[in-house]
Design a protein with these regions (language model features):
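Oxidoreductase and adenylate-handling cofactor-binding alpha/beta cores
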Residues: 177-183
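N-terminal glycine-/serine-/threonine-rich beta1-alpha1-beta2 phosphate-ribose binding loop
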Residues: 2-141, 153-168
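Short strand-turn motif at the edge of the Rossmann-like AdoMet-binding core
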Residues: 73, 146-148, 172-175
Length: 183
């Protein structure tokens, strides 16, 4: 056996393979490394109208769903808007997403955004119908807290807006043991 022949890998080959291995991390998409990938078509970008306790509670529920992104919140109370933005920003950082959450005093401005897919309506009860109708007319999916409306006319107007807008509108309904029929 020749003296200059060595077993194993040469330093030059080791450095070349190491550089190739490290370069592969810049080529691979991040989802292939961490195992999580949500297609853009599977993401739902939410906007919240009404940032009181119910809106924050609903955010907590929605935040546990994969593919949910929160883009904006709206409330007439500036303190609630600021609290919401802080909470969303902290959640986005925890998720490894660049923090960005816009806040609005007037919901009509938020409804003009094309990047928002769905709206959560958690306003005081007497605003549910109007905000839901406007959100449907803006082409947004809507999740509305109960009660949906105070009058049959409001309810019918909401249905018409949902059908005309071609988007689903859902609402909260609690289920308890007393709601069950039979066993």
């Amino acid at each position: 056996m020749k003296e200059n022949e060595k077993k194993g890998i040469s330093r030059r080959k080791f450095l070349g393979l190491s550089a190739l291995g490290l370069a592969s991390f810049t080529i691979l998409p991040s989802w292939s490394i961490n195992g999580v990938r949500i297609a853009p078509s599977d993401r739902v970008v939410l906007g919240f109208i009404g940032l009181g306790q119910q809106g924050l509670s609903d955010f907590t529920s929605f935040s546990n769903c994969p593919g949910v992104q929160v883009a904006a919140g709206c409330d007439v109370d500036s303190m609630k808007r600021e609290r919401f933005v802080r909470r969303i920003t902290a959640w986005q950082k925890q998720q490894g997403v660049a923090p960005r959450c816009d806040s609005y005093e007037f919901y009509e401005e938020m409804l003009e955004r094309k990047d928002i897919d769905a709206i959560e309506v958690a306003t005081p009860d007497h605003w549910h119908a109007l905000t839901t109708i406007h959100a449907c007319q803006a082409g947004k999916d809507v999740y509305c807290q109960k009660p949906l409306a105070y009058t049959i006319a409001e309810g019918l107007a909401m249905v018409k807006a949902g059908v005309t807008g071609g988007k689903p509108a859902t609402f909260e309904r609690r289920v308890s043991e007393s709601d069950r029929v039979g066993s």
